């Protein structure tokens, strides 16, 4: 589990939160992520009473709703080029295969392996580098 500072909220919708966060201890690691607040429902213009910019939250980053475009021969990388979007494009290296929909991979998003959950069955082997896109998610640990 890593610690992150909330820089700003990009959008709130019911229990859903979209925020820009920064890894504590590494100002160069900024992400746009989605997470859920199951105990605070907000309409679009409401302000959270539970969390605000500057607060520190702990959790694990993972990639969800991933789509594997193809195998890649390039360096490990990631980008989030769409304004206010949690979409991530990445080249990752498969390090563990849990099942046909789930892998763990080496990435430069976080220092540890990252969990990747695919929308469809994915055909890959340990050591493969794959190009994917998905949603960058934060599973909060209280």
Regions found by a protein language model. Name each.
Residues 26-50, 108-126, 131-134, 138:
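Beta-strand/loop nucleic-acid-binding surfaces
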Residues 77-80, 89-121, 125, 142:
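Netrin-like (NTR/C345C) domain of secreted extracellular proteins
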Residues 1-16, 77-100, 129-132:
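Structural detector for short beta-strands of small beta-barrel domains
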Residues 20-74:
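Acidic (E/D-rich), amphipathic helical modules within compact regulatory domains
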Residues 60-62, 91-93, 106-108, 131-135:
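Residue-level recognition of well-ordered beta-strand positions that form the cores
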């Amino acid at each position: 589990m890593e610690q992150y500072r909330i820089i700003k909220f990009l959008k709130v919708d019911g229990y859903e939160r979209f925020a820009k966060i920064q890894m504590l201890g590494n100002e160069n690691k900024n992400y746009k992520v989605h997470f859920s607040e199951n105990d605070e429902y907000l309409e679009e213009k409401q302000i959270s009473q539970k969390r605000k910019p500057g607060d520190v939250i702990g959790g694990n980053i993972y990639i969800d709703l991933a789509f594997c475009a193809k195998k890649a021969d390039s360096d490990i990388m990631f980008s989030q080029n769409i304004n206010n979007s949690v979409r991530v494009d990445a080249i990752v290296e498969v390090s563990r295969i849990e099942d046909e929909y789930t892998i763990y991979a080496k990435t430069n998003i976080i220092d540890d392996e990252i969990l990747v959950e695919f929308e469809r069955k994915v055909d890959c082997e340990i050591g493969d580098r794959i190009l994917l896109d998905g949603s960058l998610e934060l599973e909060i640990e209280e």
